[in-house]
Curated annotation (Swiss-Prot):
Gene: addA
Organism: Clostridioides difficile (strain 630) (Peptoclostridium difficile)
Name of the protein this chain belongs to: ATP-dependent helicase/nuclease subunit A
Keywords assigned by UniProt, alphabetized: ATP-binding, DNA damage, DNA repair, DNA-binding, Exonuclease, Helicase, Hydrolase, Isomerase, Nuclease, Nucleotide-binding
Chain positions recorded as ATP binding sites: 25-32
Residue ranges occupied by any UvrD-like helicase C-terminal domain in the UniProt entry: 531-839
Family the UniProt entry places it in: Belongs to the helicase family. AddA subfamily.
Length: 1275
């Protein structure tokens, strides 16, 4: 194989020496190959060969380190093939295994292990399991809080009063834990915590205009004001050349000048901007403006209306800026910040105290966590001089002398701690740091990555040869086709800039085509071509003629709607993507299958499912739905979701089994295990056991069942006379024997050994392997086994501690995600997050969910925090019950918002640049007409997308669509929604766009040729007269009548409501209907019209009222306001929705509790609400029994029974007897009360009979409470 042909820039990177070199390597530019070649040339140089162990190579992942080590090993091997006697090369192969090609954490661990004595660390330390550390954190925070409560610490109590939610301090604990994790990404976390608090410790001379908060706010306001200026320019252009609108234009011009003055003031200082904002006023547009004649041309009216609309929106936006950030003078701000000092100082104190407690707990257990790894290494490698500056320690100097050069891969993802660490071991006299990365691909800010580190060097280093601090840019893309490169450049030239994106996407940064795809002889069959955009709307209004101006509604509510993205909307887009994939895979018009280029064969082959990847910004909610929909369309799919492990049935079962082995006195896990395939108890078995006694826990009743030999006269009155079946008794005995065996084994086996013993002894591991998805299920069980092995390495031991360990793990950290069983060569469409795709490439990339709004949940936190700006707390005066975002919080929100948008832009860049041959973009929007109108605003007059529009973007489509709608290729999208096509940009990128109507993809219709009626099939059957020796026998069998035919129609269980229907209407057709299994097909939400979606049925209304009556706190129903408050609480906790709450009348509920029956219920000691009941009932007890069976056959059914099920609304004990209450929400008037009673009487009578049987107490009274007339009817 020939040697690579390096570009000029790549050769400069490979050959430059003795400098700090920053390599800005764009996506697909071959940075890894260049980095490896540089190392190879260093160690194989004839003039000055370097030993491989003299190089420190820091990679981002272990996989990258392994790949690099392997590549270097291969290169050394090839060099030895050419020169087998070379001792230096032979030595390099030996040194390679102990070379420092590693991750930053591995390097830090080596430093710690070699110098543990410098930080008084036990040499036998181990790295704590992530979940074990999470548990220790929780224990530490709880203990710190308990101590502070006992000490009555005033600052702490003030903090809790300010930010604790009603009924607990969990939110405050989360604040402390969040700030601790954030602070640990600082080289000096204690200093950061103290400085962040002390920034609020100001005096009377404080000048807000000189603060970092003011500068942060102004950075955002500048963008906003400049955007408003551009809007006013657009408005002026609409009217300035129309004579009839001269006065109107003059007024617009005055306002434009005022806003331009504000823009200039923002560039000067906060005070200047504040003055201009305060003096800003808008013109009266009625006074002094000529009325337009009715006969005036329509274009004049349209121009005026368009200009006025732009102006009104500008006015509203400016007023919003003033009210949010320019509504306080310096004195007010000073008092606000001084007040907040009493909040933020305790925050830092509590975080520091938590850090100390957590550290003590880790030391007690002899463990360190990942934060410790970096900070302990930092403590070893640095000292602090007399001026407080960080300087390298003597140990760091030793490393400086050891390493000839330090290589840092993916430098754009370094954090501040890593920067200080590697700077400490780098040479200063002869610069020797090689840093390679791409700031446009920095997407780990949520892990405290600091792209600013890369940008600082990018802006300060020069590209001159011989410079000690040099940068070289690699922007030739060797991955993607021209169409992909052009599309990426077109989008990012328009949207990425220094303010949002943190780098200007200029000619230097744009991708340059470098890939070579050998052209196939049949170009029509090659996959590729124009970049595609597919949009689908959610509300099916594509054909509306009128485009309503709903920008404000969309901007205000879209975020809220996206937070609870409806399943149906995700399904819609998934189905659309499925259709796109099928189009890619099908034979084209010329009978050809589309092909992709395969480097392995240096040629083209048919596209396969494995060539396609679907990239999502976040996978948790979307990926499972996409996977299900695609598989339903016969598209093999794998979604790497990363959650759901603890929800799998096999893991739930084994964890329940472990729980009851430790403690069988737990009903829920016990019943879960009993009805699992391990023991095979049926619902009837469980009922047989439960009805033996209502008072005992299930395990005690189970033991009694196993010992059953007939109850004696000594049975207590609460025990049932139901006799368990022999099979049930035997199952119970077998269970207890095995449980005892398991308990004994667990006493002397390690946890992991015991779990594997359970797998094999019960046969459960083999059982799940035979189920659908068996290999995945077995892999999940293996993960639990591996988790148990890790647990055994901790100081905790035993089943009890392991169960607690898992429970705390579920509460304290994210779900682990199911085990991965997919091979890299499996022929499936992959669904993955954009983050996981980084560093990968695929022939076809489908970027989906581009219409999903950016996550802004962090802004809802009580306290924001930032490395440079410190704290941004919510202002809370709990005594005066005042709460609002402080000016500091507004500053942090502005800064973090820009940083987050920059991160999102880089995420989008990573997604697009994964594509080798075909890029497809998909998204959904609530109304395509409204959205396209909004996206196309101003495209005819602006050369580029304004930073203001980028700042206001809510999702990726808000950035992509304003760019592409300027392009000639997508004129069809504008025309399809009734807008004029405007072409403002000449660009060689190619685009294809399609608007999908959801009705087009709901059902895949068969073609007419595929349809064949049943009648046509029957006509083909040759029906001859029967002529067979077996005719008589066959006829006899076919005419046989089963004597127990009624039993075949009898259900296993029947509800009281169904019996009520039978008894009220005993026509056989109704009876047969009730005794048949019913399947209710509810119309999916996404094909319901708006009226159907909004409608709440009478049944649903009743269900909601019953739910509220079930969960109400009966100690707090003494007033209508009490009940209203509780209902609001149910909404906030997610028990009911706002819409559901709106149909509950709290006054009606209050009247119930104020009634005689309500007061009696409140006074009762024992109250049961929404109680599920089950009972075996003889069919003869159902009055209509006589109508069902012929008289001659009645004796066949003497013992025929059915399991009766129902839910009793409420019953309570009074004078050792039962009072039964049933709520009814039916529409009732005074005239039909008796009809209602007759309608429900039989139902209550059945409930009463069952309750008497189950409780052993008589029902003295049965009451129906009619909410319609606020009246109870008792008998």
């Amino acid at each position: 194989m020939s040697s690579p042909k390096w570009t000029k820039e790549q050769l400069e990177v490979i050959e430059s020496r003795e400098c700090n070199l920053l390599v800005a390597a764009a996506a697909g530019s071959g940075k890894t190959a260049v980095l490896v070649e540089r190392i190879i040339q260093m160690i194989t140089s004839r003039e000055n060969p370097i030993d491989i162990d003299k190089l420190l190579v820091v990679t981002f992942t272990n996989a990258a380190a392994s790949e690099m080590r392997e590549r270097i090993g291969d290169a050394i091997g090839k060099a030895l093939d050419e020169n087998p006697e070379n001792k230096h090369l032979q030595n390099q192969l030996v040194l390679l295994n102990k070379s420092s090609i590693t991750t930053i954490h591995s390097f830090c661990l080596d430093v710690i292990k070699s110098n543990f004595h410098r930080i008084n660390l036990d040499p036998n330390f181990r790295i704590g399991d992530q979940t074990e550390c999470a548990i220790l954190k929780q224990e530490a925070i709880e203990e710190v809080f308990e101590d502070l409560y006992e000490e009555r610490d005033e600052g702490f109590l003030n903090l809790v009063e300010s930010y604790a939610e009603r009924g607990g301090d969990k939110e405050v604990q989360d604040i402390i834990l969040g700030i601790y994790s954030f602070a640990m990404a600082s080289p000096e976390p204690k200093k950061w915590l103290i400085d962040s608090a002390e920034r609020f410790n100001i005096d009377e001379n404080f000048d807000f205009s000189q603060s970092i908060w003011a500068r942060a706010i102004l950075d955002t306001v500048k963008i906003e004001i400049n955007g408003l200026c551009l809007n006013m320019e657009r408005a002026l252009k609409e009217v300035e050349s129309i004579e009839e609108l001269e006065t109107f234009a003059e007024k617009l011009s005055v306002e434009y000048k005022k806003i331009a003055d504000i823009s200039q003031a923002c560039n000067k200082s906060w005070d200047e901007a504040y003055k201009k904002m305060a003096s800003m006023s808008f013109e009266n547009y009625v006074k002094g403006v000529k009325r337009i004649s009715k006969d005036a041309p329509s274009y004049i009216k349209e121009s005026k209306e368009k200009a006025k609309t732009i102006r009104d929106k500008t006015k509203k936006s400016l007023e919003s800026i003033v009210s949010a950030t320019f509504n306080k003078d310096n004195d007010s701000i000073r008092e606000e910040i001084k007040y907040l000092y009493n909040i933020v100082k305790p925050i830092s104190s509590v975080v520091l105290r938590f850090e100390e407690e957590y550290s003590n707990k880790k030391r007690e257990k002899g463990i360190i966590d990942f934060n410790d790894i970096e900070h302990f290494a930092l403590n070893i490698l640095t000292d602090v001089d007399e001026k407080g500056n960080i300087v390298p320690s003597d140990i760091a100097v030793g490393y400086r002398n050891k390493f000839y050069e330090i290589f840092i891969d993916e430098y754009q993802d370094s954090n501040l701690v890593q920067e200080v660490l590697l700077k400490a071991v780098a040479n200063t006299e002869t610069p020797n740091r090689f840093m390679v990365g791409d700031v446009k691909q920095s997407i780990y800010r949520f892990r405290q990555a600091k792209p600013e580190l890369f940008l600082q060097k990018y802006n300060n280093y020069n590209d001159k040869k011989g410079s000690s601090h040099r940068k070289i840019m690699l922007y030739k893309n060797f991955r993607s086709r021209e169409e992909v490169v052009d599309a990426v450049n077109y989008i990012f030239e328009n949207i990425m800039n220094e303010n949002i994106g943190e780098i200007e996407y200029t000619e230097k940064e744009r991708l340059n085509l470098g890939a070579n795809f050998n052209v196939d002889t049949d170009e029509k069959s090659i996959i590729g071509g124009a970049t595609e955009i597919h949009l689908i709307q959610k509300d099916n209004k594509l054909d509306d003629d009128i485009i309503n101006d709903k920008d404000d509604r969309i901007n205000n509510k879209e975020n809220e709607i996206e937070e609870e993205e409806k399943l149906d909307n995700i399904q819609l887009e998934a189905r659309m993507v499925g259709n796109i994939i099928k189009d890619l895979m099908k034979v084209n018009e010329d009978g050809k299958i589309q092909k992709v280029y395969d480097k392995g064969i240096d040629g083209y082959r048919p596209v396969e499912f494995r060539d396609i990847v679907i990239l999502l910004r976040a996978t948790s909610a979307w990926a499972p739905v996409f996977a299900d929909e695609l598989m339903n369309m016969d598209i093999p799919t794998y979604a790497d979701v990363g959650v759901g492990y603890f929800d799998t049935i096999e893991i739930k079962t084994i964890l329940s089994l472990l729980q009851i082995i430790d403690n069988p006195m737990q009903d829920i896990p016990l019943i879960s295990v009993l009805k699992s395939p391990i023991f095979g108890f049926t619902p009837e078995d469980l009922i047989d056991i439960r009805v033996q006694s209502k008072d005992k826990i299930f395990y005690e009743v189970l033991k009694s069942t196993a010992e059953y030999d007939g109850f004696t006269d000594s049975q207590n009155e609460n025990e049932s006379e139901f006799i368990p079946s022999e099979e049930c008794i035997n199952k119970s005995k077998d269970f207890l024997i095995k449980l005892k065996e398991f308990k004994e084994k667990s006493m002397y086996m390690s946890t992991d050994e015991f779990i594997w013993y359970l797998y094999t002894r019960t046969g459960y591991y083999a059982y799940v392997g035979a189920l659908p998805g068996g290999s995945q299920r077995q892999a999940n069980l293996k993960v639990l086994f591996e988790r148990a092995k890790q647990f055994e390495e901790t100081s905790l031991k035993g089943i009890f501690n392991f169960v607690n360990f898992i429970e705390k793990l579920k509460k304290s950290s994210s779900d682990m995600g199911s085990a991965k069983t997919l091979g890299e060569n499996a022929n499936v469409v992959r669904i993955m997050s954009i983050h996981k795709s980084k560093g990968l490439e695929f022939p076809v990339v489908i970027c989906s969910a581009m219409g999903k709004n950016f996550n802004t949940q962090d802004f809802k936190k009580s306290i924001l925090y930032h490395h440079n700006l410190g704290y941004g707390p919510q202002f809370v005066d709990y005594e005066r019950r005042i709460s609002f975002p402080s000016i500091a919080k507004e500053a942090l929100k502005s800064k973090i918002n820009i940083e987050n948008l920059s991160e999102e832009m880089r995420v989008l860049y990573v997604a697009f640049t994964r594509a080798k041959e075909k890029l497809i973009i998909t998204g959904s929007t609530r109304n395509i007409q409204d959205s396209i109108k909004r996206w196309s605003n101003g495209i005819e007059s602006l050369d580029t997308i304004s930073q203001y529009e980028i700042l206001k973007g809510k999702n990726f489509l808000d950035w992509i669509m304003p760019c592409v709608l300027r392009h000639r290729d997508l004129s069809n999208l504008l025309e399809e929604v009734g807008l004029d096509a405007v072409f403002n940009v000449e660009h060689n990128s190619k685009w294809y766009g399609k608007l999908w109507n959801k009705n087009d993809i709901l059902v895949e219709k068969k073609s007419d040729e595929e349809k064949e009626s049943i009648e046509e099939i029957l006509e083909k059957i040759d029906v001859n007269n029967p002529d067979s020796d077996y005719y008589g026998e066959i006829e006899e069998k076919l005419n046989y009548i089963y004597p127990y035919e009624f039993s075949t129609r009898k259900p296993a269980t029947i509800s009281v409501t169904e019996i009520k229907k039978i008894q009220n209407n005993y026509e056989e057709e109704l009876i047969n209907t009730i005794f048949e299994q019913k399947v209710i097909l509810k119309k999916p939400l996404f094909i319901q019209n708006e009226e159907e979606r909004e409608k709440i049925s009478g049944t649903e209304r009743g269900t909601i009222v019953h739910l509220v009556m079930e969960v109400l706190d009966l100690k707090n129903v003494s007033s209508v306001n009490d009940i209203k408050s509780q209902i609001r609480g149910f909404v906030s906790k997610g028990i009911i929705t706002e819409k559901q709450a709106s149909i509950v009348n709290p006054y009606k509920i209050y009247k119930f509790f104020a009634s005689n029956i309500g007061k009696r219920m409140l006074n009762a000691e024992i109250i049961n609400r929404e109680k599920s009941i089950y009972a075996q009932v003889n069919m003869k007890d159902i009055y209509i029994y006589e109508k069902l069976i012929n008289n001659d056959d009645k004796k066949l059914y003497d013992n025929e029974s059915v399991m009766l099920r129902g839910i009793v609304d409420a019953y309570f004990e009074e004078d050792n007897q039962i009072v039964l209450v049933d709520y009814k929400t039916d529409f009732v008037n005074e005239e039909n009360i008796n009809q209602i009673i007759e309608k429900y009487k039989k139902q209550l009578d059945l409930y009463a009979d069952i309750i008497e049987t189950l409780t052993g107490k008589s029902v003295k009274e049965k009451c129906i409470y009619l909410f319609g007339v606020d009246e109870a009817v008792c008998y």
